[in-house]
Amino acid sequence: MKMIDKIAADLCLDRDYIFSVVKRSQFYYRDYYIYKRDGGKRQISQPSSELKTLQYWVKNNILSKLPISSSAYAYQKGASIKKHAYFHKNSKYIFHTDICNFFPSISYEHLQPILQDNSKLFENLNIDFDSVETVRDICYRENKLCIGAVSSPIISNIIMYKFDVLMLDYCKKNGLKYSRYADDIYLSSCSYIDRSHVCFLSSLLNKFGFRINTKKTYFSSPKYRRKVTGLVIGTDYSVTIGTEKRKLIKKLVYDKLIHNKGDSNSILGYLAFLKDIEPHTYNNIIAKYSQYCTEDIIEALSK
């Protein structure tokens, strides 16, 4: 059967209605912009509830069955920036770069051959493979992945699978650790990371249709602050949130409890983040500022 018929049957929705959403999917997005750290803007394209439902179906029934590398630390169950940082924490030298314009650079031509190689999936779902382009219509907009679509993160990991495997194999042969967190790529080692390794990485990325973002490329060592996905690795190889964020959290808690200034949800989010990365610091803050409360500090902040 056609994929649209399968989706209609599984979701108990009218087939013609789904057909209409799929064929006009480009118009089922709401666009808005958020500011980036460098002052630029990032477009977010939020799919409507109708299209999002179809994207979830594709994600759960097709995309989730495709291989993803263990070197990919984002968008997976159980993944976290903490686990990612701990993977590199014992390395003396760290190299970081990111991929230019990552999601919008991922076209359907990246995904189509992978779906072709896994055509058995469609057979198991009793779906005619000749209707595979319905995946494109549901998950892509103008042949690009959208930041905001529920299917985009997993597709990005899927299409990077072969790249991750090749990079991991190369790094193992050269005494390096390799990981990727979305569009952030890290190499680390206990010895100096030669630029030839970076050249290999850049060349391989180019073969997959991507480019290194030179503005966000850097080397770090114990002489300089080493950071992995926002977390700081100390000279004692501990993983922390860093002095600046620690001071910020203390100030936010103080201002809220003493002057009733600040957003409670934001502060609670910061505290949850701190508790996960630095539980001892979290406990110290709770103990210190509890003197200003006659009730549990978390309950006080929740009001």
Regions found by a protein language model. Give the residues of each.
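"…together with the soluble PPM/PP2C metallo-phosphatase catalytic core" -> "…together
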Residues: 155
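Catalytic palm active-site di-aspartate
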Residues: 96-100, 148, 152, 173-189
